[in-house]
């Protein structure tokens, strides 16, 4: 789906306030990344720091942080589990998030309760209006 020129693939789930997407990989692992609109708002991303593989995470944990010339963001999500994988390509070359936000997952989490994912993250059809309002605000 396109919203004011920004792409939001239909097969992902979204959290519009944090501008993140989730891809359910199997019944316990999810990939997490930044939306097209989120990368646009951040500007050129020059650093990504992520939890290490094997680390436990909970709703207070910073799963990853992103730095750009105009913004630093720490991403906490209501997820409990363990870091299953870290995208080292993104850590080494963070600007690929700007180029390919949906191919550039940052972390994969083995989630303890998949119902939390389904309650927190929504299909684009359910959060379209929130993203549309945000896009109108930032695009001039």
From Swiss-Prot:
BP GO terms, sorted: glycine decarboxylation via glycine cleavage system
Ranges for domain Lipoyl-binding: 29-110
InterPro entries to which the protein is assigned, alphabetical: 2-oxoA_DH_lipoyl-BS (IPR003016), Biotin_lipoyl (IPR000089), GCV_H (IPR002930), GCV_H/Fam206 (IPR033753), Single_hybrid_motif (IPR011053)
GO cellular component: glycine cleavage complex
Co-factor requirement: (R)-lipoate
Pfam families: GCV_H
N6-lipoyllysine modified-residue sites: 70
The UniProt record lists the keyword Transmembrane helix: no
Keywords: Lipoyl
Cofactor comment text: Binds 1 lipoyl cofactor covalently.
SUPFAM superfamilies xrefs: Single hybrid motif (SSF51230)
Description of how the protein assembles with itself and partners: The glycine cleavage system is composed of four proteins: P, T, L and H.
PANTHER family reported in the protein's UniProt record: GLYCINE CLEAVAGE SYSTEM H PROTEIN, GLYCINE CLEAVAGE SYSTEM H PROTEIN-RELATED
Family membership noted in the UniProt record: Belongs to the GcvH family.
Function: The glycine cleavage system catalyzes the degradation of glycine. The H protein shuttles the methylamine group of glycine from the P protein to the T protein.
Protein name per Swiss-Prot or TrEMBL: Probable glycine cleavage system H protein 3
Gene name linked to the record: gcvH3
């Amino acid at each position: 789906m396109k919203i004011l020129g920004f792409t939001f693939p239909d097969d992902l789930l979204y959290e519009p306030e944090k501008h993140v997407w989730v891809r359910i990989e199997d019944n316990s692992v999810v990939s997490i990344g930044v939306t097209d609109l989120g990368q646009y708002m951040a500007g050129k991303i020059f650093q990504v720091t992520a939890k290490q593989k094997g680390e436990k995470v909970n709703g207070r944990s910073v799963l990853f942080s992103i730095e750009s010339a105009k913004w630093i963001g720490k991403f906490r999500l209501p997820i409990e589990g363990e870091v299953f994988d870290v995208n080292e390509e993104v850590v080494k070359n963070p600007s690929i998030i700007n180029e390919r936000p949906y191919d550039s997952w940052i972390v994969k989490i083995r989630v303890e309760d998949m119902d939390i994912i389904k309650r927190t993250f929504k299909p684009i059809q359910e959060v379209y209006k929130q993203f549309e309002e945000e896009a109108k605000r930032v695009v001039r």
